[in-house]
Amino acid sequence: MAKEKIRIRLKAYDHRILDQSAEKIVETAKRSGAKVSGPIPLPTERTVYTILRAVHKYKDSREQFEMRTHKRLIDIINPTPQTVDSLMRLDLPSGVDIEIKL
């Protein structure tokens, strides 16, 4: 028998709200009777931007800024219709990007 699985991928710049959102999803899925695997931390994506501090010259004087994208993966195995319904009603912060695969 093939097992059904919902894979949820979360992305955010702030790891605290990402972990809170992941905890809400896991708690909601467990309450509805589904088996949950995760949250699994995925590698953090780090983007570095280098700009010149001065406008015209002084090429040796530069400043670097970085942007970190934190990611988590949650698998919900054998979800019930109640699980899917409760996940659809879940209210998550606006800074979290959610990608769901069935």
From Swiss-Prot:
Which parts of the chain are coiled coil? Answer: none
Disulfide-bonded cysteine pairs: these are none
Give the InterPro entries listed for this entry: Ribosomal_uS10 (IPR001848), Ribosomal_uS10_CS (IPR018268), Ribosomal_uS10_dom (IPR027486), Ribosomal_uS10_dom_sf (IPR036838)
Extract one GO molecular function annotation from the record.
structural constituent of ribosome
What Pfam family does this protein match (any one)? Ribosomal_S10
Query: How does the annotation summarize its subunit structure?
Result: Part of the 30S ribosomal subunit.
Q: What role does this protein play?
A: Involved in the binding of tRNA to the ribosomes.
Q: Which family does it belong to?
A: Belongs to the universal ribosomal protein uS10 family.
| HAMAP family given in the database record | Ribosomal_uS10
Give the protein name, as stated in the record.
Small ribosomal subunit protein uS10
